[in-house]
């Protein structure tokens, strides 16, 4: 299949749009800094994977979509949720295990969820979100075209790490997406390492991940993911094409995480020189320079935006600290679909057992 080219369109966008991207990246960066502090202070339990260094990917990709386009991702999910519009206080409360969290404190860091913004979760099993991405695309297409009788115009974004391309579920999802013409874009956030394993050591065709898309008849592009303007330039026409022809796509999004795979990762598999090389390409610094040199935005204006995001995140931490913990009764909620009631200790959910239309399980 042809590797698609893309024009430079971000340069023509209003300064206010670029400042909005900068604001969102500031928010993600500050949120993750405070997340690390809270984790180190043992206010956050479980696993924790921060998004520092990769902010341009989530912000640029989301900017290229509509709010009702489904999004699903892996366990490094904070950036995607915030970029999609999740209120950071509900994300922070989730990691603190509080009832007011975006998943009632039951998901934690790896399982942000915000249906109001079409963010269908972070998922903890490597590659497990890829069949869900294909399924979301199938659902929107079926709903719009079969049930609605029109043409589907939704595009699902399915984010995954480079390690997930080695999982069988990913290849099955790609095959079905190509076979059924599903409008899903698989975005590989290729930060070069699957936990501590360099991509060249664990993945065939590491220099050309697009080969995996071509094998399934899927168009693909490669994007420089350390620059939010490049991300938007690549994603906007690609998303538009997927929306128009209702076909899948594949993106090799080349990026770099500044921190470890998780909070417990000492990063001994990377050299200090390598890390310094990529930190010099900080996506936030890149956009700051563009705004300063090409849009005449003053340093003080950008500092004011950052200070505002810091205040929002501080408020989110305070909200999470003061939010109520879930009661023991929450253990029995969200187990069954709500119309069929909570578990009551009997062999059947209460409302289902009391339903006059229930036939005792006979078929």
Where are these regions (language model features)?
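N-terminal amphipathic, basic-rich helices that act as targeting or association modules
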Residues: 1-76, 84, 301, 322-323, ...
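Conserved thiamine diphosphate
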Residues: 141-152, 205-237, 280-306
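Cofactor-binding active-site loop characterized by glycine-rich and histidine/acidic residues
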Residues: 36-37, 41-180, 198, 202-205, ...
């Amino acid at each position: 299949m042809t590797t698609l080219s893309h024009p430079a369109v971000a340069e023509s966008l209003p300064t206010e749009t670029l400042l909005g991207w900068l604001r969102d990246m500031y928010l993600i960066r500050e949120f993750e800094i405070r997340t690390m502090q809270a984790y180190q202070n043992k206010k956050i339990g479980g696993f924790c994977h921060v998004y520092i260094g990769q902010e341009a990917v989530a912000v640029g990709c989301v900017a290229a979509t509509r709010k009702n386009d489904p999004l699903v991702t892996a366990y490094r999910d904070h950036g995607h949720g915030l970029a999609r519009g999740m209120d950071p206080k509900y994300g922070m409360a989730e990691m603190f295990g509080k009832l007011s969290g975006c998943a009632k404190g039951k998901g934690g860091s790896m399982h942000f969820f915000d249906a109001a913004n079409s963010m269908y979760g972070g998922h903890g099993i490597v590659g497990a979100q890829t069949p869900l991405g294909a399924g979301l695309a199938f659902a929107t297409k079926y709903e719009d075209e079969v049930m609605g009788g029109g043409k589907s115009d939704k595009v699902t974004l399915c984010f995954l790490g480079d390690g997930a391309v080695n999982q069988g579920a990913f290849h099955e999802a790609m095959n079905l997406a190509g076979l059924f013409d599903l409008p899903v874009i698989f975005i590989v956030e290729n930060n070069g390492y699957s936990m501590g394993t360099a991509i060249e050591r664990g993945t065939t065709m590491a220099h050309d991940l697009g080969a995996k898309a071509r094998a399934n008849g899927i168009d693909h592009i490669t994007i420089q993911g350390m620059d939010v303007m490049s991300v938007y330039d690549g994603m906007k026409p690609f998303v538009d094409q997927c929306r128009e022809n209702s076909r899948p796509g594949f993106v090799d999004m080349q990026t770099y995480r500044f921190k470890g795979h998780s909070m417990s990762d000492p990063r001994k598999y990377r050299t200090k020189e390598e890390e310094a090389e990529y930190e010099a390409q900080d996506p936030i610094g890149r956009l700051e320079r563009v705004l300063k040199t090409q849009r005449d935005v003053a340093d003080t204006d950008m500092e004011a935006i950052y200070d505002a995001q810091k205040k929002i995140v501080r408020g989110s931490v305070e909200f999470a600290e003061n939010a109520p913990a879930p009661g023991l009764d929450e253990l029995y909620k969200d187990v069954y679909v709500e119309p069929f009631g909570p578990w009551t200790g009997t062999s059947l959910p209460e409302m289902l057992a009391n339903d006059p239309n229930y036939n005792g399980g006979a078929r």
